[in-house]
Structures are given as C-alpha cells and as structure tokens.
Amino acid sequence: MNNILSNSIKSLRYWDDQTVKAIFDKYQINVSGIYNISDDILESDLKLHIAQLLFLIVKHKEEFSVYLGETHLEKILKKLVKQFKYLEIRFLGKFKGKKQFFIDISDLHVDNILEKTEEIIKLIKKQYEYIKKQKKRRLDGVYVGIAPRKEKRGDAGAATAWSYIAFDFDVEEWKTNKMPTEEEIMEKLIKYLSKFVEKDILPHKVAFTGGGLRFILYPERPILEEELILLRMIAEDLGADIAMYDLARVDRLVGTYNYKEKYGSPRPCVTIAQLTDEEDIEKLLTPIILYEKFGIIENYKEFEVLFNEKREELYNKRGLNNITTTINRLIKKPNLNKTILQDINKRIYKWLYTIQDKLTKKLGKRWIEKLLSYLGIDYKYGKNGTRLDLWSLFFDDGKNPDCSIYINEGYNAVMVDFHDPNMRFIALAGLWMIKEFRDKIIEFLKLHNINPKPSTYRTVREIMNELLDRETIKIEAEGYLPKEAIIKAYQLSIEQGVPVFLKADTGRGKTYTLTRNTREIKEVFKKHAIAVAFPYKIQVLQVGAGLHADGVVVPMYYEDGKKLDKNTIHYLTIGTYDQVENMLNDLCYDTYKGEKIQVANEEDILLAIDEAHDLVIQKEFRKRAITGVKKCIDRAGGCVLLTATPELINLNNYPVIEVEFKDEKKLFERCSIHIAKNIIGEFCEYILLMFRQGWIKNAVVLVDNKKMIENIKYTLELYGFNKPIYVITRETVGIDKASKMIINEEKVPEEGLILATRVISEGVNIKNHVDLVWALYCKSATTIRQFIARCRNGGGELIVTAPFKEREEEPMIIDYNAMIEMFKENYKLLKEYLETDIEVLKELDKNYKKVLISQIQNAIYYDEEKKDWVLDEDEIAHIYNSLLEAHITRDYKLLKEYLEKTTGYEFAIKTIKELKESKLDKFLKYNYLEYLEKVSAKHIIIAFKEYGVNEIKNALEYNNYKKFKDCRDEYTPQLIKKHSKRINRSINVLKDVYNIPEVIEVYNLMLNKGKDDDKKSNLDENTIKKCLEEINEYKKIVKEINENEDRKTKKIYHIDLKLLEEHKDKLSTLARIIEELILKTFLCPPSKWGKIQRIIRAVWNIVVGEDDERLDRRKLGLRSLVAKVLIKVRDFAIERQKFKIRELIEVIKEECGFTLTLDEVRRLIRAIFNCVIRGVKKLGENAVVEIKELNKEFKTLYEIIKQNINSNSVEKCEKVIEKKIEENGGEILEMELYELIVEKLKFVEEVFYKALEKLKKLGVIYEPKPGLLRIT
C-alpha cells in the first residue's frame, strides 16, 4: 500500500480539496483530457492497457504469489496457468464477418510482451477498417476476455481464471446523448474512490467507460471461478454492477471507443487515473486481504478447507453451485442457499412451522406483513394481494424481485427465491436464515407473547445418554437374581402406587426366581396370588415346561385359550399379554356348583410383566393386548416390570431397581458393527463364505422383517447353500425343529442357519455355543440388545448391522415433554413434525412412516366416563421411543456407543470387505495348507512351478503376494477366493497339470471331486491319468511336426467327423473331458451369477443365436433351441407390447415346436423386460403382460456380449472345426482339435469376465444355476 495512503488518507472519512489535490498530483489523474482526445493518445492508452494485461498474465504464468493462508491454492493455480493459451478479442455489434479473435499466448514471456501488444493493436485496426467499409454496420465496441482461454472458444468451458479484478459503476444520468461534465465525473470519482480508501484499498487504475467508471485492480494471482461470488458481494457493498461476475466475462478494452447509439457520438473508454506508479506495477493486490477488508470471509482456515477438500473433486465436474454453496457459509453478508436450508430441515424447520401457526392464530392470516415491517424490509403487493414481492433481501439485480411470499393460509406461507426457483420453503425459515434478523424475530415473538422455545430440539446422543445415565436403586448379587430383589420391587410399587422396573442382566433367572418363590413372596404382602405375563406363547410354554419338570403344574394362558390341569396350583398363573385380564378374573373368581364366587379382590393380586420393554416397543402391532396389560397394571395391588433394558423405554421415569452381579459373564470372541450398503447381498456373501469354508457350523440371525427373511432364504437357496435353514416367526413357534429345541432343550441346532424375527429376542434361552450371532435388521436398539443376550454362554462372533450413511450428521429430535405439549396444542402440527422427521428414516422400512402416522390417529381418544377427549401418553411414548431407537440403529456411531455402554463389549466398525479380510487373514495364518487346497488349480500350478511350497507358505503368512507376477492379477486372498470355484471349468489347466507330481490330487481339487454331490465330476482318477498320457503323446507329435519341414512325412491322425465317431472308444477320454468342460462353460459360464442369472442366460442365448441360420442344429453342447425360443419371445413382446400369456405360448409352440410352461414364461419375460404381469394366480395363462422397456441389466449385458461375439468375428465351434477339416483335406490333428476348442472356450471366458466387471457395480452375489428352460 502506498505511503501517501497510509500516512494521509487512511484515517479520513471525507476528502477535502487538499487531499484530493495530493492524490491527483501524485497519481496522474486527468479528467479534462477525455474531451478532446486524439486517436494517437487513445492508441497509446490501449497499448499501455494491453501491455499491463499481458505483463500480468506472464507474472501469473511464471511465478504467482499466494498469501500465507492460501498455500493450499498453489497446486490448483499451477494447473490452471498452464492452460493460459489464448487471449480473446471480441467485437460486438451488427456487421458481417468474424467477431471473435484468439491471440496465441502459450509462448508469452517478458521479452515478447511488446511484440504481442503490437500484434493485437494491428488486429484491432485491421478489423476496424474492415467494418468501416460495410455500408450496413453497427459496432458497439471492442472487448477482451478477462480470463485467458484454454481453447478457441468464448464460453465458460474454455475460460480459466480472471487475470484482473474490475468493479464497474454505471451512472444512469450519463447514459444519454449528453456527455457528463468534468465536475460530474470528478464528483463520482471521489465518491466511489473514497469507498475503497475507507477499506484501506487503492485500485491500480480508473477508467471512464462512456456510461460510468471502472476501477481495476491487479491481483498477485489469478482469481478462481469460485471466488467471483465474493467479488460480487464486494461489488454489492460498493454499489457497483453485480451482474458481470461470470468466468467467461469480456470487458470493454481501455483505449477504444464506446459506440453505443444512445450516446449520439462515440465516447472514449480511457484511463483517467493511474493510481500506481508504472515502475511499481509489480506491487500487486493480495485477494484474500481484499475479502478481509470488506468483511466477506470470516476466517482463513475455512477458506483453506474449501479449496483443499471441495475444489479438486468438483472442478472437473464444473460443480460451481456446490462450491458456491460452501463459500456462502464463509460469507457474513445475508445469502440463502440450499445446503443451509437442508440443515434447517433437520434441526429447526419443524419449530419454525409451529411458530408460523402461532403467529396466524395470534395476528391473523397476514402476520407476515407485520413481521416484515418490524424487520424494516420493504415489499410490494403482487397480483390480487396474495403475494408479497421483496427486493434487496439477498441480491438485487434490478430485474426480478429477490423473492416472493405467497400468503396462502398464514401458517403455511411459502417463500420462493427467484434466483433459484427450485427453492421453496416456509417464509419464516427464509427470514430466519439471515442471521441479522434472528434477534429481531425473537423480539417480535416476545412482543406478541409467543414463546419461541427454540431449545426443545435435542440431539439423539444427548437424549440417549441422559436416559442411560439415570439414577437407579442398586442391589448387589452373585449368580442368579435373589428373591429379596423382587420383594423390594413389590414393596416400592405398593408404597408409591406406580409400577417399578426390576433391571437384571438377561440370563440371571428373573422369571425362574419369581416362579419358584411365588408362595413366599405373596405371603410377605398377604396377597392372594401372583400373575406373570409374557409377550409370546413360546415363553409361556418354556416356563411351564420348566415348572412341570420340577413337579409343579400351573395354569397357562395363551392365544389359543386357557390350558388347565387337574393338579394345578392357584397362587401362580402364567400367560401371554393378551390373556392378562382373563388371568386376573380367574384368580379373583371361582366357580362352585355352576355359580361364580368372588374369592379375592384385584388389589389382592400382584402382577409381574416379563420383557416389559415390549409394552412400549411393540405397541404398534400389539395395541389391543398391551392396552389391556396397562389397564390391569392400574387395577392390580402392585406391579413389577421385569427387563434387562429399561433405559430407552422409561420415558415416564418410573423407579428402577438395578441388580449388579459381581461374577464375570462369558463374552463373544469378536464384536463388530457392520456398515452395509446392500444388507441382503453382503449378508449372503459372508454367510456363504463362512459356511462353505467350514469356519462356522451354526448361526442365529435377527431379521425383524418377514419379507426380508423370505428374500434371504430364496437368495441363499439360489446360490446353492446346502445347510439347513430354519425360520422362526410368531406363527412358527413350537412347530419347526429349531423353536422346539429352544423351548424344550434351550439349545439351537448344532448345524444350520436360523433366521428369526424379534420373537427370538424375548425371554428364550440359548445355552449351547453359537458360532455366529448377527443382528441384521431391526429398527429397535432395545430389541437388538435383548437378542444379543439370548446367548447365555456367549459365542464366536457377534455382528450388528447398521445402514451406510452418505452424510455424517448429528440426528436431532424434539424433546419428549415438548412433543406432548405440541400434541396437546395442535395435533396437525405434530403430524407435520413426524412426517418431516420420519423422512430421515425412510431407508429403514417403506411402511415405517405409515405405521407411525397411523398411531397418531389413536393417540387422542374420547373417554366416555370423562365425556372429553383424552391424550394417550402411552401412545406418544411409543411413537417417541420408535423415533429415538430408529435413529440409534440407523447411525453406526450411536449404535456402537449404545451397545458398548449397555453390554460391556467393545465393537469394531467394519465394512463387509474388512469382515472377510480379518477372517481370511486369521485363517491363513494357521491353516495356509488347508486353504491352499481350495485355491484355483491354475494358480497352484503357477505358484508351485515358479516359487515352490516355502515361498507360497511365506506369502500366505505375511500377506505379501507381489512376487507372484506370473498370475493374471496380484496374488491376494481376495483373488484366491474369487477363482477358487471358477477356474476348474477352464480346459487351459490341462496344459499345465501334467508337470505336477501330485497331478491326481490337484486335478481332483480342480474338479471339486468329493465335494457337493450336485457338483461331482464323472471323471475318475484312471480316466484323468489316461487323459494326461494322451496329452503328453500329442505334445510329442507336435514336437515331431515342428522339427520336420516336410508336412507329407509328418505322423498325423486323420480325423473327420465320421472318423471321430468310428474311433470314439479310442479317443473317448479326451473327447469326454472336452465335451464336459464345454457344456459347463456354455451353460454355466465361469462366473458366479446371482439374482440376475436368468438375464445373463437370456442375453447369451439371444446374442449367440441371432445370426445363426441353423438354429435347430446342436453340436458340442450348443443349445440352439433355447436361443430360438428366446429370440422369438423378445421379438413377439416388443412387437405386441401388451398380450396374454396364452398367446405367447401358442406362438412359441407353433414356430419353435416347444411348449412353454407358465413359470417359464414368467422367468423369460422378467429376464428380458421391465414389465407388469397382472393376475397370474387367478387367471393363469389368461394373465395379461404389459411391456414397459428392456430390463436395464439386460441392456448392459447385451451391449457387452454383442460387442465381443458376432458372426463376423467369432464363428460357432462346429463351423470352425468343419472349416479346419476342409482346409486340411478331411483330416485334422487331435491336438489341433483340442487347441481350437480351447481357444473358443478362452474367448467365451473373457467375454463373461468383462460382463462380470460391469455386474460387480450392482453389489450382488453371483452363482451358477440351471437355465431358463427345461432344455438347458
């Protein structure tokens, strides 16, 4: 900054004549010269301006400067300045000929600046002369691109970064045919210049443009596209034009004329003030200091983070809007943007909605007008007075209102931002976004006696920790729950008249102690009997069976009715929730000679509710039963709520007695939080790996969704999962083998997979060892914790799945008490809140929103006794708990914190890849030889031959596979697994196998001999050995042929198709292997196909069959009929679009001679098309099929395979063989036959590998499966 500024002008707010004179004398300010300016002087000004601009570009290209806080920009800028290739000169107006010229500046340096300047001057003069010769012409002016171009284009895609900064001040009164006077120009110059000086900034030059003034600043580095919004903010602050800040902007050249017709005669665009010495031109402006002086950026660190994290990834995508949004966070000036509005939706949007409703009730429908007046915001009425238009709220471009507010129903007033029409939001949210308005909005609310209550929204973490940390009455114990704890709980319940929670770890014998000590407990309180309620029938049966084993038979009540025995006792009754009222009635009354006699009052009955957390968690689908339990709790003489997990459900803050046990409990060996993008796919992938490798024998999985269980079961069966799968739901309890074992033996099967809903998490015991316990899907954190505790003796591995989150954000919900108040105040607003909040949870379950919203309908009910509407707070507690627990299960960090606090386990956060790798690494360390046998034969051979056993052993132990460079890819555990069951289908292995001494054993492994029955090869060891001997003989023959130049003397086998048939016995070994492997490759390609395997087969058969004129021929395993059927199905469906299944069956039968079944038609259609099939169950073959479009996966595969297989590039195996036989005069070497087939198979394999790479992106698992039709 120049001395004269810092010493004499810096502190002055108003300029006096002496100060102005000092500046003018120092810095060559000349206004009077513009009135009689000559062409020579104007040309000199043009040369100086262009030379300064070129010097600046050279400076930026060779060595630009960055501020201390901007070191992160250096990498970005270096990349940009390399793209400074062209300077655009543009002529604007109406004339014939070229208007854009691009000067090559790629070789620009200090020594050729003057040469380039002269080149530009000559170009401008030449174009001037050319335009003057035209009779019909109108030239507006000559312009230069502020940003150098990387291509010969003038759009934003070719622009790089601004080389200088310009602020244009348009003066409306100058835009007439009257030239402004010297005094008028001086007045405006002083006015605008003083705004810069007050900020301690001095422009490098000022130019008169004809209709205003331009202030030019030379920065020490290029100005990035993202920074233009900052310049726009400064321009708005200065009162300059804000519409010029786009990257491709062209600026009127200083030293030329402004030819606009409204001026009457041309006006010079000329420098009137050079405020920097020519020799000091290198003293350039630091951009971030400019932003700081004008108060635009709050701190440098955020500015640095912006470019460090955001710029690099968004620059290539030209994501200016996203970057601008981030910049807006750093700007102190009011500015509305989508990102911050998204934050509002999560945090206070719902609160603002309630405030609008209160304002409408208090001030009427047009409250918004009063608020705008209070905030000092000017507005105008739009059409019919239903709209308010606001200017200068965010940006004033002088054309459109900045935004409009549509009044509608007052509380639903909507604001629309005209700078981004997609942004629509409630009016109060838009005003609240401007920080300067918030205090005044609060003042306005208090002025009208409206309590804003902005603190009623809290983070889920805060609420969760508050509930977990509540004080409890602690009792110490060892082993099992003492009866004194139960007596203490009943005593507290009777004294306070409220139910009391008895908290004890699962597996500590809560129900055992209660049911075995009933007589003593009831006698302490002089009560008649105790009734114990359980959520499920399975628990009633399990407890009843235990008592029966001890010689005690009790009345048992469950869904099917009452079940009594002659020798039952009458001081203890057990039953399910829905039978509690029946239990109380039967305990209070007895029947004598057909008459009902009361033997006790309800106050004489003690009630115990097992798994009491279900009273809150399960209310949405067990409303009637739980409502009956709640009524009985109020009627009974005392109530104890038994649970191990009362924390998140105890919203009413009932007393809690917590029993702490001193002895150590058995833990799981490993505990993980699994972050899943594809829950079913990743689960199936891991389960298949674990069971197939023999690493686990049994697994218990919580899947609280019956449809998901069906999908998992179907998927696993599709993949060839051959272990027993047991499904336990409420309907199958006591019926299937697994649930019977749990009830009667407290064990799960030693082998197999158990998929269970939440019924397994309630009161059951699993006392044998479980290799894998997995909470896969459940929207209740309490239920997950209960499920984990079912395994009384721990287990091998514990996994809890949480969905993957793209955005890391702290979830928030309204405070519980505030929620009740909101409900009382306005039911409609609570519904709005829930609909907004549940939108966050939509990934959990599509029906979840509907379920919760339906509960609101019953939260307020009409009480016939009170003759008034009553709020059911239990219903609100259920809704609130559901939201709270769903947020916890959806956020893996919250879930980890909750489980670690409540279980005592330590959980590691892992993806499915990390889960598999950790398991593989541990296994390889101790079982490398066993795992080596499962590796693909091809890689075993290469590794053994080249490196030996010891090298393989070291590689597997130390996880270092780089040395296996001869393998197709890097030799990693993932690659080993990928090829372990696929390479066996490639006949290429036969080339290498014979070199291995243990050939029989390796080849047995290659063919999976002795493994799954359905995958056994028909080849025995003798056959393989014979085959290998033949191959050795063929190799000798080939060697002889190569050594002998005369082909006539070569020893060959004369083979044609007939001869091959005649010598079938002699050559059967090799032929059988070739045919078997070809069939496997064609019908079961060497990739693991999953749920879209039908699509793959459909595509393959259509592609390979499309150009074949002999579709009915079959040789070497080609299934031509399949292709013919598929092609006809596709063509028929595309042509008809809508048809009955029967019509398609008839066409295929007539033209292909093959009758399709109903299931085959459905599989074919769904494989090829995105379609709707209506009424299949009812109408059968008369069901209507409506085709929409080709299946997306079908399209993708079709393109891949079609590009690689066509009649021109690859012919069918039989064609190739026939052609080869014909070329050899009816003879062919068996080795040649072998090589032909190998080459064909290899090509097919490569095609499917390409398809597989595409399919991997879908995130599904693949496994071979029988084809679409019976003939495949």
Swiss-Prot record:
Record-linked InterPro entries: Helicase/UvrB_N (IPR006935), P-loop_NTPase (IPR027417)
GO function terms (MF aspect): ATP binding; DNA binding; hydrolase activity
Signal peptide residue numbers: none
Coiled-coil residue spans: none
Pfam families reported in the protein's UniProt record: ResIII
SUPFAM superfamilies, sorted: P-loop containing nucleoside triphosphate hydrolases
Entry keyword set: Plasmid
UniProt protein name: Uncharacterized protein MJECL28
Organism expressing this protein natively: Methanocaldococcus jannaschii (strain ATCC 43067 / DSM 2661 / JAL-1 / JCM 10045 / NBRC 100440) (Methanococcus jannaschii)
